[in-house]
A protein has these predicted regions:
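N-terminal low-complexity, acidic/polar interaction/targeting segments
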Residues: 1-190
């Protein structure tokens, strides 16, 4: 693990994103337009999982993302596609005068244990169906390594409409097997 040498901007959102996950964000508030400007010229930014019922200080981790695409929506609003390169532990948060938050972070390991591929084919094929039936999701991912068990389980966790507090239990380094069992039980009704 390495520490990030500078402060990174923090964007609090109810978005759960694991390494290699991609999502599209619509940016319209001036302070977050400034965040995007800073992030695009530096090291990216942190998406801080922020449910409506939580405060910034309750969550001590985030998704460190790079901006991989800029676009303008049909309504003229800036749209950015971001990809998570790593989870990070948030060591401290500072607030600037423009109400932007910045954090000192260090990278956090995620699912480094050996992965079991026994249930992969069923989860992979059902995920491939989701991509085929969702044009926007399908276009976000140029590569879909559905042969990679941790990638498949991570994408399912991001997509499933379950409570963020439950998803939060799967961010720890050794939580892969629990995550796989959870996704398998929901998707395949086991």
């Amino acid at each position: 693990m390495k520490a990030v040498n500078s402060r990174l901007p923090i964007f609090p959102l109810p978005v759960f994103l694991l390494p290699n996950g991609i999502t599209r964000l619509r940016i319209f508030e001036p302070r977050y337009l400034k965040l995007v400007k800073i992030a695009s010229t530096e090291q990216g930014f942190i998406i801080l999982l922020n449910a409506k019922s939580s405060s910034l200080t309750e969550i001590k981790w985030g998704s460190w993302v790079d901006i991989i695409n800029f676009d303008e929506g049909e309504d003229g609003v800036l749209e950015i596609d971001v990809q998570c390169k790593s989870l990070v532990e948030i060591l401290s948060i500072e607030n600037e005068k423009e109400q932007l938050n910045f954090g000192c972070v260090k990278e956090k390991s995620h699912w480094s244990q050996k992965v079991n591929h026994i249930k992969l084919s069923e989860l992979s094929s059902s995920l491939e169906d989701v991509f085929k039936n969702n044009i926007m999701l399908n276009t976000l991912y140029n590569e879909k390594p559905t042969h990679n068990a941790s990638w498949v389980v991570a994408r399912w966790l991001e997509l499933l409409p379950i409570n963020l507090a439950i998803k939060n239990t799967f961010i720890n380094d050794h939580s892969y097997q629990d995550a796989e069992n959870f996704v398998h039980a929901i998707i395949l009704n086991d």
